[in-house]
Amino acid sequence: RGLGDVYKRQVMSLKYSSTTADYLQWSEAMNLIRKLAKDENYKISLLVALGCFTGLRISDILALRWKQILNAEEFTVIEIKTGKQRTVRINMQLQKHICDCYKHISPIGIDAPILVSRKGTVYSIQRINVILKEVKRKYRLHIGNFSCHSLRKTFGRQVYNMNSESSELALVKLMELFNHSSVSITKRYLGLRQEELLNTYDCLSF
């Protein structure tokens, strides 16, 4: 087996993990952000907050630097996966949390990456996934597979739930934000397609 086969297996593994990750209920996600900060785990609190409030992929969050998000109303990224430009607005609550985390983390400067390990290097995606599994156990989260993708899905589900009266419009917006090629992909990504299929059984009665 050559390197090509190994690479294909890694890609398939990542693709599979992205479709099987679950999402947090919004209230539980917000409680987790607060609990992590209370326990002085400001880096992971910031990670969860950014993931849930922006819907960015983990690779794009890890590439962020303080100067992009500190005291900013919005910031722009070039998505690593797609190469497309995306502008993200930071609401007031998230701005405050970013400032609080910055004060407690005390990075070497605003040019520094926002998520740096004790070794002085940016966290890897694999390490973040390990940390999130530890967080799930410690805080007894009501979620199956908790990984980096869970934060992005939590964002998507909350946007969808908050716009239930115009759900199709919400899906179109999410499709564009996620850079999906169709609404059906977005529905499948958020687990909505599976829910629709399962709800079919509830229509039956004696």
Segments and roles (model prediction):
Residues A63-Q95:
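Conserved tyrosine-mediated DNA breakage-rejoining catalytic core shared by Y-recombinases
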Residues S13, L24-T54, E165-S166:
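Basic, Lys/Arg- and aromatic-enriched nucleic-acid-binding interface segment
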Residues V11, S18-T20, R89, Q93, ...:
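DNA/chromatin major-groove-contacting recognition/catalytic segments
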Residues R1-Y7:
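Short, small-residue-biased leader/transition segments that mark boundaries at the very start
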Residues W26-A29, Q93-I143:
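Active-site/catalytic core of tyrosine-dependent DNA strand-transfer enzymes
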Residues H142-M162:
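Short basic/aromatic active-site micro-motif
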Residues D60-I61, G156, S164-H180:
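Active-site-proximal segment of tyrosine recombinases
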Residues E79-G83, F178-C203:
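Catalytic-site neighborhood detector that most strongly recognizes the C-terminal catalytic loop/helix
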